[in-house]
């Protein structure tokens, strides 16, 4: 009997990610249950090259129109935008979404069916936000979840080190990463998410 093997991302797909990594955003949804067993949907956008979480928002009723508006907001305030947007084949990425994204000038790249590894960077962030934040917090409602995620994203972007980018945080200034003070100063710990995490700074 011929043995079958699970195949990873194709060489063509890997080449695309390698060649255009600095021009790619990825987006995805994940679900969060509140303490009253309501289901909330979290939509987020992450930059492939820097690992910066560009946008995160919560809704109880995701639609193609709502999802498209999130991409529009990503491109506001002179943030710039990517050339490519990687996402799966969820029904929320419908005709309205397609039209709005195309008008912005971003090309959609749909992953194959049942291939989460094709959107691995987005999937990895979902794992991080769950294990480092949501698994330790009781969520009361939509507003509370938005607040918790905003605080975690601030920590993730500005302070959390990433192995894939040389143990730097996505938005950390290079000066912070390389600065060595000639004079020793007191180090203070600043709590994040109710002391779930801490960031460390030199005292002024």
Language-model segments: residues:
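Charged DNA-binding/catalytic regions of mobile-element recombinases
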Residues: 1-204
């Amino acid at each position: 009997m011929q043995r079958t093997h699970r195949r990873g991302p194709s060489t063509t797909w890997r080449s695309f990610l390698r060649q255009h990594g600095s021009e790619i955003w990825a987006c995805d949804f994940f679900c969060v249950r509140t303490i009253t067993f309501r289901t909330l949907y979290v939509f987020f956008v992450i930059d492939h090259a820097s690992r910066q979480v560009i946008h995160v928002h919560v809704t109880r009723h995701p639609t193609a129109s709502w999802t498209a508006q999130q991409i529009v907001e990503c491109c506001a305030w002179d943030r710039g935008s990517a050339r490519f947007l990687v996402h799966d084949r969820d029904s929320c990425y419908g005709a309205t979404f397609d039209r709005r994204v195309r008008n912005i000038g971003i090309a959609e790249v749909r992953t194959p069916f049942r291939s989460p590894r094709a959107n691995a960077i987005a999937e990895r962030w979902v794992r991080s936000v769950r294990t480092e934040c949501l698994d330790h917090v009781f969520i009361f409602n939509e507003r509370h979840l938005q607040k918790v995620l905003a605080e975690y994203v601030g920590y993730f972007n500005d302070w959390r080190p990433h192995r894939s980018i040389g143990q730097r945080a996505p938005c950390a200034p290079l000066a912070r990463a390389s600065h060595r003070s000639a004079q020793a100063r007191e180090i203070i710990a600043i709590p994040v998410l109710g002391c779930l995490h801490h960031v460390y700074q030199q005292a002024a």
